[in-house]
Amino acid sequence: MCIRDSLSTYSLESGWYKFGGENHVVEINSIKISKDDLIIKLLNQPIKKSFALITPAVFGSNRLSFRTPQTSDFPKIKLMLTDKAIPYRHRTQGRLSRGRYAVPAGSVYVLEEPLDKSWWEWPEEWFPNEGISLKKIGSGLCLPLDIKGLA
């Protein structure tokens, strides 16, 4: 059995739901979070030169997946601590999405230049759009890190 906590900007009634590409049945227990809660404050902090993924990340186009956004406004990666890519699929409107590979949660990115944006401010163009932007379903949700000795 796997227990997973998730954040959602869309309110769900507590109960049992089918999720995932293979229709896994999960129990959802919704808890309202206020703007003053610690998790919201952490998620709203701008990312400087390092961050860690708390959900798997899929960046790139509808055809290709990458470890980072492939745009000129995303800083170059100086260092990256990660594991091998993981399979990633989602289901919307009764249809199973294209199989992709995602950067696993827990991966740490160190950037050459500060990003100065929280995850909420990241452009949707950084994520694939398959009828719905993968950002809207939480792809690449991350928290800033403060790594000592990192200039």
Regions found by a protein language model. Name each.
Residues 4-151:
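Conserved active-site/ligand-binding neighborhood in enzyme cores
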